[in-house]
Design a protein with these regions (language model features):
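Alpha-helical transmembrane segments and their helix-start/interface "positive-inside/aromatic belt" motifs
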Residues: 1-10
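Hydrophobic core of alpha-helical transmembrane segments in multi-pass integral membrane proteins
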Residues: 11-12, 204-215
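Interfacial/capping segments of alpha-helical transmembrane domains
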Residues: 12, 16-44
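Small-polar-interrupted transmembrane alpha-helices in polytopic inner-membrane proteins
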Residues: 15, 70, 85-108
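Short juxtamembrane and helix-loop transition motifs at transmembrane-helix boundaries
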Residues: 44-56, 80, 90-94
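Individual transmembrane alpha-helix segments
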Residues: 52-84
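Hydrophobic alpha-helical transmembrane segments and adjacent short intramembrane/lumenal linkers
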Residues: 100-208
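Short, highly charged, low-complexity non-transmembrane loops/tails of multi-pass membrane proteins
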Residues: 225-242
Length: 242
């Protein structure tokens, strides 16, 4: 997870610096239509108006399905020895870097964080973790260790699948946040209708989401390992015999 996070942050940084040095980079990554729409919304005093378009439930279904699809592609990218997984991280990293730069360049950086990262904290973290699952699968193929390659592959595939399945509820919650909560928060910065959520609500959601990701996927596994626990083939947590 640490390796995947560092690589993803590197790709995001490349996206930011590329946007800073090439005005057309943002349009090339996000598309002219999206950039033009965002600039029109900013000019109208409703910079995050895109999150108010459409039926919330329809958005919830589509966003949830799309995010799970991206995660699944990152997972099966492990069958390509991690190359396709890396490609997905590259594309999403550049997109995120260009996307955030667009708002910071308009003086809307902090506001964009308070609105977009309500759902983005869980969504982006889950995609990075899904990529980690892809690399676990690739590692089982490339580095069998003392196991036969077929056995190593099966072990890697099983571990990676468990990680991927654990992400499904997170993607569902992220889709709910984007469709309903981000929808409300976007109204906070609508000059014509600033009846959205208070800033403190956004900060609380961001903090809780980030704390959950760090605790469940980083701290908790480390603590289990230090206490001598391990995960059985059937997924049950057990303790090593002393």
């Amino acid at each position: 997870f640490l390796f995947t996070s560092v690589v993803f942050i590197l790709f995001v940084t490349i996206g930011v610096f590329s946007s800073m040095n090439n005005e057309e980079f943002v349009r090339g990554v996000l598309g002219d239509g999206y950039v033009d729409m965002t600039e029109e919304n900013i000019a109208k005093g409703d910079p995050f108006g895109v999150y108010k378009d459409g039926n919330p439930f329809s958005m919830f279904v589509w966003i949830g399905f799309n995010n799970i699809s991206v995660a699944f592609k990152a997972f099966i990218g492990g069958f390509t020895l991690g190359l396709f997984t890396m490609w997905i991280m590259w594309g999403n990293g550049l997109m995120l870097g260009a996307f955030q730069f667009m708002f910071f360049a308009k003086g809307l950086g902090i506001k964009s964080v308070l609105v977009i990262w309500i759902h983005g904290t869980l969504e982006i973290s889950a995609i990075v973790i899904a990529a980690t699952a892809g690399f676990i699968l690739a590692s089982g193929i490339l580095f069998p260790g003392t196991y036969a390659r077929s056995v190593s592959f099966k072990r890697g595939a099983k571990d990676a699948a468990k990680v991927l399945i654990s992400l499904v509820p997170i993607f569902i919650v992220a889709a709910f946040f984007e469709s309903y909560i981000t929808h409300l928060m976007s109204q906070t910065y609508d000059k014509a209708n600033n009846t959205g959520l208070p800033v403190w609500a956004s900060v609380c959601i961001l903090s809780v989401s980030l704390t959950f990701i760090i605790w469940y996927f980083v701290i908790y596994p480390i603590r289990l390992h230090k206490k001598g626990y391990y995960i059985q083939p059937d997924g049950i947590i057990n303790r090593l015999k002393k």
